[in-house]
Amino acid sequence: MAAASSFTAAAKFLAPVSARSAGDYKPPLPLPASASLRPGRKPAPRLRTALAVSSDVLPGNKAAPAAAAHSAVTREEALELYEDMVLGRIFEDMCAQMYYRGKMFGFVHLYNGQEAVSTGFIKLLNQADCVVSTYRDHVHALSKGVPARSVMAELFGKATGCCRGQGGSMHMFSEPHNLLGGFAFIGEGIPVATGAAFAAKYRHEVLKQSSPDGLDVTLAFFGDGTCNNGQFFECLNMAQLWKLPIVFVVENNLWAIGMSHLRATSDPEIYKKGPAFGMPGVHVDGMDVLKVREVAKEAIERARRGEGPTLVECETYRFRGHSLADPDELRRPDEKSHYAARDPITALKKYIIEQNLATESELKSIEKKIDDVVEEAVEFADASPLPPRSQLLENVFSDPKGFGIGPDGKYRCEDPLFTQGTAQV
């Protein structure tokens, strides 16, 4: 059906030069003997890998894009990818409707346009593998198997939500699905993901709780803006030092709220930061689910074999503003139309039909099925009860100074403004 992928055939994570900057590449200097930690100890060889599988976004890129051929996918795999991406898109569109109708509160960040990244990575995971997300986490939860009705109920703040209504849009957790969060502040989730990967390695090597597939893998999702934070660099260092089974997935949608990625970092090619820590750095077209899947498969299998972490930069684009409160006035119309024409769902649909993996009517039936799933999720969330007042106190371990918190779950406070503020709780 298709030739071996450019990633697998040309690299296998071993290419020592970036396809996007081959003319500027200089081999790293050997480590001086004085850098050895112990007298007489030879420094360990460093893996210096930076590979661009494709490129589209960054200006000034003169390198030819990677071959368009995809690795073969079966009919079942293609339809699974399509269904998951359509679920993410339709679910997020419904979230926008419900938000503007006053059914959701606070900030709501949608994932439209980035579905190829979530689907391409998460659908390759086992149940025991972990996902750590950001504030843009609804679709990651859906891809990991959290039911749409549980995610929608959480967005509605209902007791039937995956966090019993206490997490909301930016804090999706599900213990049964090993979804370890949504984290509202950028970079917060990366140390959690690194810790989860350490726990997986400890279980495997120390407790001998191994699975036949190898190590459990953790995916850490974060955006381009996070890559200028200290936690990012600290965790890359620790993960490579201990060869942790983790994949760092950068969803580079080119904008950190209203700040262009090209104005926020000294080197906009994030994947090149991987080799600085001795781990592979890979760039992939995040608007193409099949290319993402190729790279994800190799990175996940590499982690599962105990060969350590990988940094993957997925260049993608969000089709809506930063949040539903963002009028999206800073991005140029021609930029938005360029990426709208590269819609990852439309591209996959075209591929499936051209490869005779399914008919258009079969794909329409999937879309109808997902419409029904999302409609049912809204009905379920709307009919679900609000959390009881006493639930607020379940995880409060001390009485805040100045307030009395009774065992009946009701606040008592001398300050009438506080009482007014919590009257509707």
Curated annotation (Swiss-Prot):
Pfam families: E1_dh. One of its GO terms (biological process) is pyruvate decarboxylation to acetyl-CoA. It catalyses: N(6)-[(R)-lipoyl]-L-lysyl-[protein] + pyruvate + H(+) = N(6)-[(R)-S(8)-acetyldihydrolipoyl]-L-lysyl-[protein] + CO2. One of its GO terms (molecular function) is metal ion binding. Residues 1-66 form a transit peptide. It is an enzyme of class 1 (oxidoreductase). Its EC number is 1.2.4.1. Mg(2+) binds at residues 224, 253. Its cofactor is thiamine diphosphate; Mg(2+). Thiamine diphosphate binds at residues 135-136, 184, 186, 224-225, 253, 322. InterPro entries: DH_E1, PDH_E1_Alpha_Subunit, Pyrv_DH_E1_asu_subgrp-y, THDP-binding. One of its GO terms (cellular component) is chloroplast. It is found in: Plastid, Chloroplast. Keywords: Chloroplast, Magnesium, Metal-binding, Oxidoreductase, Plastid, Pyruvate, Thiamine pyrophosphate, Transit peptide. Pyruvate binds at residues 109, 135-136, 184, 186, 224-225, 253. The keyword Oxidoreductase applies. NCBIfam families: PDH_E1_alph_y. PANTHER family: PYRUVATE DEHYDROGENASE E1 COMPONENT SUBUNIT ALPHA, PYRUVATE DEHYDROGENASE E1 COMPONENT, ALPHA SUBUNIT BACTERIAL AND ORGANELLAR. The pyruvate dehydrogenase complex catalyzes the overall conversion of pyruvate to acetyl-CoA and CO(2). It contains multiple copies of three enzymatic components: pyruvate dehydrogenase (E1), dihydrolipoamide acetyltransferase (E2) and lipoamide dehydrogenase (E3). Tetramer of 2 alpha and 2 beta subunits. This is Pyruvate dehydrogenase E1 component subunit alpha-3, chloroplastic. It comes from Oryza sativa subsp. japonica (Rice).
